[in-house]
């Protein structure tokens, strides 16, 4: 069906009329949201907020937590719940986030991305085009929740399905909605050819039509960055300039930093049990298993790096979907799975080797930590949008995975460690600015 949300809801309503209560699906009948039992919400909570965070990265979860923490200071009785997938649910549990119980029924976006990936390769646009059934399945769960519970505000951080299907069917909207994103539209990879350029242009045209045909559907649209972070150029042939269009339809907050107040670096290093004199290198590849190839390439470079940097201590953060047992670790290398305070390690270490995700690279930039980043091949955000943003801060060194050897990785590490010019400062109030905009909707 061209309009699967509407068809599914018609089928649901038809079945509801003809099934007994015992036969009906339990979806929509939920127990109390899960979270830290010490967190208690007043029965007279001023507002109920449903946060819907993208499944694509833990960094997006960290920024949403930062925004939520500010919201709680502005509205002490607020009830914030997350509709989220693993591994984000683990991050939320570690930070007292309340997870809506329907989250356990969500289809896995992370598993889909992993199935679409190759050796340090992920054609993000093509992967998105092939996840329709995941988007619609998760939207149906979302719609059941907002129809059966009284939420005052939905905060959709790159929750593409929610935004798309509510725009297609505005009558389904049940609460105020705030759209949060760190990118506007799709960009074709230069090497992908004319077909991808035509397809991204069509997707962008549909997005523009949705927003301009229903200008009041989004109660606010927040770009998590600054106007300069949008690359120059149009959305495609015959379409508006992306930056100019975004300036008309978005409010800009700067990037919300989870590590905005991590404290003095020496104290932070001590709290993480980093020893004086160590040169700590953190390797981090995000919340999916796509980064396994990058970890192996970096591990192969470790013996050379250790020879050149005798005080080197390498800590690999494999992430929640990769077991440390997966890797043949050289002597002296530590490997950890899920680390809920990764942002602190990124702020405290001497150098980081990471994938090309925006959240991680911006956290490193804000902390002033030197880093190398290896964008996933074919991933337009990591190859086009992230480097464009980082250039404004003179931060990070972009490395091409396919061209990187052990020697070139070590040489780049040495150059970054000895670099004297500091990165440009990053605004620290992005979470506060975003939360204040959201607060106006409560």
What are these regions (language model features)?
Residues 170-188:
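Active-site proximal beta-strand in glycosyltransferases
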Residues 341-385:
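A donor-sugar binding/catalytic signature common to diverse glycosyltransferases
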Residues 53-65, 291-293:
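A short, glycine/small-residue-rich beta-strand->loop->alpha-helix junction that serves as a flexible
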Residues 116-163:
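Conserved nucleotide-sugar donor-binding subdomain of glycosyltransferases
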Residues 187-289, 319-321:
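A nucleotide-sugar donor-handling region in carbohydrate enzymes
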Residues 1-32:
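Catalytic active-site module of serine/aspartate enzymes centered on a nucleophile-bearing elbow/loop
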Residues 253-351:
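Donor-nucleotide binding loops and adjacent catalytic segments primarily
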Residues 74, 78-130:
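Conserved nucleotide-sugar phosphate-binding/catalytic loop shared by glycosyltransferases and other
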